[in-house]
UniProtKB/Swiss-Prot annotation:
GO MF: haptoglobin binding; heme binding; metal ion binding; organic acid binding; oxygen binding; oxygen carrier activity; peroxidase activity
One GO BP: hydrogen peroxide catabolic process
Organism taxonomic ancestry: Eukaryota, Metazoa, Chordata, Craniata, Vertebrata
Entry GO CC: blood microparticle; haptoglobin-hemoglobin complex; hemoglobin complex
Biological role: Involved in oxygen transport from the lung to the various peripheral tissues.
UniProt source species: Stercorarius maccormicki (South polar skua)
Protein name per Swiss-Prot or TrEMBL: Hemoglobin subunit alpha-2
């Protein structure tokens, strides 16, 4: 459960993400593909080379979806319902992959935000991204 302080930190840090959605998203995906190569199987039609337009475009979609979740911290289930349906019923993505991408996104935040990425921010984002992963996994049950 996100506390009021967690929500405040998430909103503050998200302001620093704005304008970098495509870069941060692409970097998180590339990190995931390198660290967890099995995740590439969900993208057989993508050019998985560094900086490809497809990775950049999908990365932007991912981070934009996270931004929509940030705007709806008190109602993540509703905010992510369509994405949950898409990933569960159409794409059939193994839910463990949401956690893997979350870890990679945390690394991207830490790299780019430097001293602003405090232990408190890390903890808040860990809770937030875990909640997002849980919501995206709801339809699998």
């Amino acid at each position: 459960m996100l506390t009021a302080d967690d929500k405040k930190l998430i909103l503050q840090i998200w302001e620093k993400v704005l304008g970098h959605q495509e870069d941060f998203g692409a970097e998180a995906l590339e990190r995931m593909f390198i660290t967890y190569p099995q995740t590439k199987t969900y993208f057989p039609h993508f050019d998985l080379q560094h900086g490809s337009d497809q990775i950049r475009s999908h990365g932007k979609k991912v981070v934009t979806a996270l931004g929509n979740a940030v705007k709806s911290l008190d109602n993540l289930s509703q905010a992510l319902s369509e994405l949950s349906n898409l990933h569960a019923y159409n794409l059939r993505v193994d839910p463990v992959n949401f956690k893997l991408l979350s870890q990679c996104f945390q690394v991207v935040l830490a790299v780019h935000l430097g001293k602003d990425y405090t232990p408190e921010v890390h903890a808040a984002f860990d809770k937030f991204l875990s909640a997002v992963a849980a919501v995206l996994s709801e339809k699998y049950r």
